[in-house]
Amino acid sequence: MEKVIAIGVPGLFIVGIIWLIITSNKRINNALSTASKTLGFTYIPSKNIFRKKKIFGEIDGYNCEVEVYTRSHGKSSTTYVSFFAYFPESFEMGLKINWRGEFDGDDEYLTDLFIKRNEELIETSKKNLRRLRVEDAFVNSRKVLFRKYYKADEIVKTMRDVLSLAKAIK
């Protein structure tokens, strides 16, 4: 009896983990599919549950995309959802504003002007858009895939927030 318990309990644990992974994958796929229909985007499902999932399209002249991907960190891994809004034209300043709020650019004068015009807007946006990054070509917000992003309306809302920021940046 003890041998059955010693083998059965770990076996049930492993089956439970596999079931949880498959169920979570189905839920995010359904949320992405629904969000893509709402936004009018194209959805590319992944056959493999560990591969990147992506929806993309255009809103008001801005190419947008949402990616769900897993990044390994040694023995553990984290799944992220990343929202991109690409500017119709690049600023071509070598501009980089990372998620910590650190600014960098090739042309210091132009970069300083850009920062002065947009600093308050970006700082305010960082409250809603975690890990916010702004570069010459795009605005990006990356978040850990929590339960709320299994809902299509949260994906749509965050994509629209990222797009609104991209439109407001001058």
Where are these regions (language model features)?
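Feature marks short, highly hydrophobic, charge-poor N-terminal signal-anchor/signal peptide-like helices
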Residues: 1-10
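Solvent-exposed, well-ordered amphipathic alpha-helical segments
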Residues: 4, 67-68
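Generic signal for short, ordered secondary-structure residues
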Residues: 14-15, 141
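Transmembrane-cytosolic junction motif
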Residues: 15-39
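Charged, low-complexity intrinsically disordered regions
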Residues: 31-35, 39-45, 50-52, 56-59, ...
